[in-house]
């Protein structure tokens, strides 16, 4: 991971100032009365805006043990959690606090699939399809289902889908929303190799269009060239809640994955 600078407590690849597409400075978050992390900086810059291999990445994977703040960070960026301190910028302006405005920028896929059992696969996508003109919604839904290999199951009720099919249905929402920022929590949970390959195609196309990705995971993801942001509570965390956060390059971080 290139373009790093080091702070007193943490280090992560950044750009000076809010110059990236998605940039955070000095983030700290509490869960109840416990400090989850602090002094967290990062930048995500689309590949279309930087020379190849230079500067901040367009994708970052979040790794670390359970409870280290991976999901909390994603939920913060999605607007569901407020930071105790710190700022997040979107194209040199503070990320909008209004949910409707933020939803035009980020799509968040949590670790739960949010599939309604009484609705068909296609009907489960109606809300996300509302971002499209009314006359194009059916086509948009069918295209999204095709992208994740669920075209043949469009009329099947959610309760009849397997765990992997429900996960693919959740990921198809990315194709409907078409936002520049994807926030993904354990996106490949329950997916087989063929489904992961389809998801990899989605990620490549998104990044090629200038999109950026932040994903929490315990397993390798199809995100070649992504940076790694490690959240590791240590002895100090037991006293202050501080997390050790480190930019770790493009290689797997050894035993940290598991």
UniProtKB/Swiss-Prot annotation:
Keyword line: ATP-binding, Cell inner membrane, Cell membrane, Cytochrome c-type biogenesis, Membrane, Nucleotide-binding, Translocase, Transport
Entry's localization field: Cell inner membrane
SMART domains the record matches: AAA
Enzyme Commission number, as recorded: 7.6.2.5
Domain (ABC transporter): residue spans on this chain: 30-257
Function: Part of the ABC transporter complex CcmAB involved in the biogenesis of c-type cytochromes; once thought to export heme, this seems not to be the case, but its exact role is uncertain. Responsible for energy coupling to the transport system.
Subunit structure: The complex is composed of two ATP-binding proteins (CcmA) and two transmembrane proteins (CcmB).
Similarity comment text for this entry: Belongs to the ABC transporter superfamily. CcmA exporter (TC 3.A.1.107) family.
Protein name per its UniProtKB record: Cytochrome c biogenesis ATP-binding export protein CcmA
Lineage: Bacteria, Pseudomonadati, Pseudomonadota, Alphaproteobacteria, Acetobacterales
């Amino acid at each position: 991971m290139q373009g790093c600078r080091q702070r007193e407590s943490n280090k992560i690849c950044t750009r000076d100032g809010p110059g990236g597409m998605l940039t955070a400075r000095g983030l700290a978050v509490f869960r109840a009365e416990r400090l989850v992390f602090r002094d967290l900086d990062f930048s995500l810059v689309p590949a279309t805006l930087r020379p190849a291999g230079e500067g901040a990445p367009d994708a970052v994977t979040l790794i670390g043990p359970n409870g280290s703040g991976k999901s909390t960070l994603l939920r913060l960026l999605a607007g569901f959690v407020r930071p105790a301190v710190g700022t997040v910028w979107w194209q040199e302006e503070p990320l909008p606090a209004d949910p409707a405005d933020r939803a035009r920028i980020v799509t968040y896929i949590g670790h739960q699939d949010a599939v309604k059992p009484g609705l068909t696969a296609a009907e489960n996508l109606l809300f996300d399809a509302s971002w499209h003109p009314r006359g194009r919604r059916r086509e948009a839904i069918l295209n999204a289902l095709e992208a994740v290999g669920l075209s043949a199951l469009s009329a099947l009720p959610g309760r009849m889908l397997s765990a992997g099919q429900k996960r693919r249905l959740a990921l198809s929402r990315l194709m409907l929303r078409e936002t520049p920022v994807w926030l993904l929590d354990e996106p490949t949970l329950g997916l087989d190799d063929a489904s992961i390959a389809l998801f990899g195609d989605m990620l490549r196309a998104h990044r090629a269009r200038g999109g950026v990705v932040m994903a929490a995971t315990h397993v390798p993801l199809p995100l070649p060239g992504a940076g790694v942001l490690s959240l590791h509570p240590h002895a100090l965390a037991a006293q202050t809640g501080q997390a050790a956060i480190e930019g770790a390059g493009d290689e797997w971080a050894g035993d940290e994955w598991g």
